[in-house]
């Protein structure tokens, strides 16, 4: 993604002039903000934009976008986010067995999924309930390996307290077969496992509908 943004920026620099160049470059920053990609390459390109267009009317919006990008990329991983080593895991069960004897709320997501990110705004009550009732919050990302760093930063940026696993090749297809349909997986997808490691809800309620989700978690705990 970084190379794509850089190529686009320098293509605009060489191919366009004046207001057209200025607007095209500014859109790169605004699209990054709007789509929450937070491409780190844009941080250095911001300096280039300022040199080329120091009086640009786009500057307030570009500065805001760059500020959000920088905040994301400078996010530290807090102690309450855990990334267990699952490199040897062959199945989903190998992962859930790490939390034997506990109810598990699994959130299947990806960094590129807008609805997944939007749902994170509603996780407060779920986090409080999980802490009080020893429920494991397991965030299962279907991101590709090349997005590993972004995946970790995004988990921290959104304050996703809990366990974080990125799908491994060994059980990638199993995730799609188990929770998808005809080879496609719609995310976000929420799954609840009981204390015996059995799936109780293959399509649990979103944290946005907390009262209903709480009932499902309580049922899984019986």
Regions found by a protein language model. Name each.
Residues 106, 138-140, 191:
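Conserved hydrophobic packing residues within short motifs/helices of P-loop NTPase cores
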Residues 1-95, 101:
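Oxidative protein folding and maturation machinery
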Residues 100, 108-125, 142:
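Conserved redox-active cysteine motifs that mediate thiol-disulfide chemistry
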Residues 19-20, 99-100, 130-133, 157-158, ...:
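A structural signal for short secondary-structure junctions
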Residues 110-114, 144-146, 170, 207:
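Solvent-exposed loop/turn segments at secondary-structure junctions
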Residues 103-104, 188:
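Alpha/beta-hydrolase fold active-site loops
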Residues 73, 128-172, 180-181:
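Conserved segment of the thioredoxin-like fold in thiol-based oxidoreductases
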Residues 160, 169-216:
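Thiol/disulfide oxidoreductase modules built on the thioredoxin-like
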């Amino acid at each position: 993604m970084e190379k794509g943004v850089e190529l686009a920026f320098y293509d605009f620099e060489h191919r366009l002039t004046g207001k057209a160049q200025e607007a095209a470059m500014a859109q790169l920053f605004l699209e990054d903000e709007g789509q929450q990609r937070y491409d780190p390459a844009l941080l250095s390109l911001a300096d280039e934009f300022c040199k080329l267009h120091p009086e640009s009317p786009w500057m307030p919006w570009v500065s805001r976008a760059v500020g959000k990008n920088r905040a994301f990329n400078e996010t530290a991983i807090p102690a309450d986010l855990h990334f267990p080593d699952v490199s040897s895991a062959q199945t989903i069960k190998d992962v859930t067995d790490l939390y034997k004897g506990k109810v598990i709320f699994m959130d299947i997501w990806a960094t590129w999924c807008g609805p997944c990110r939007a749902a994170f705004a509603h996780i407060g009550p779920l986090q409080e309930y999980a802490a009080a009732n020893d429920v494991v919050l397991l965030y299962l990302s279907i991101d590709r390996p090349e997005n590993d760093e972004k995946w970790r930063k995004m988990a921290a940026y959104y304050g996703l307290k809990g366990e974080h696993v990125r799908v491994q090749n060994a059980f990638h297809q199993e995730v799609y077969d188990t929770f998808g349909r005809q080879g496609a997986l719609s995310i976000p997808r929420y799954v609840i496992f009981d204390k015996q490691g059995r799936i109780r809800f293959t399509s649990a309620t979103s944290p946005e509908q907390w009262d209903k989700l709480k009932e499902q978690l309580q049922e899984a705990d019986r």
